[in-house]
Amino acid sequence: IDKMKKSSFLLATCLVFTAVSNAQTFLTKNGKISFFSKTAVENIDAVNNQVVSVLNTSNGDIAFSVIIKGFLFKKALMQEHFNESYLESDKFPKATFKGKIAEIAKINFTRDGLYPVKVNGDLTLHGVTKKIAGTANLIVKAGKIAASSVFSILLADYNISIPKMVENS
């Protein structure tokens, strides 16, 4: 991360839901979020497989929570800098998203298929909450629902600063 020059992350989510108490609420405790940032010196990427997420198929409510320290990097030093210097994970231990899938009633959750959807809501990261909107794919297969989405955020929007000497190197 010391060599990070870009001030944005590309976030990808992949969640596989299974039904809980009633057929309209689906839950996963092992969703996946990854991020990628391209720099001139070195690309930075990490994966977190400990994402908790809930989807209500009757009203389109969707939410997830991720423990920041759960992101794993290829290099230990990157992980250390990410947690201590950039995301300050002791002070801001998790990120959350609370939103809604538009036109959820048009999706037939009893029929296998790929359903492109629009999602919007509030992403809270580093103690800052911002509205985000994007597209996602819902995949229904054998009674299970998988969701995936890719979106970009600007680090500055979430008060995540990169030291000038790192940004300019």
PLM regions: where:
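Low-complexity, acidic/polar, glycine-enriched regions of mature
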Residues: 23-169
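Bacterial Sec-dependent N-terminal signal peptides
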Residues: 1-26
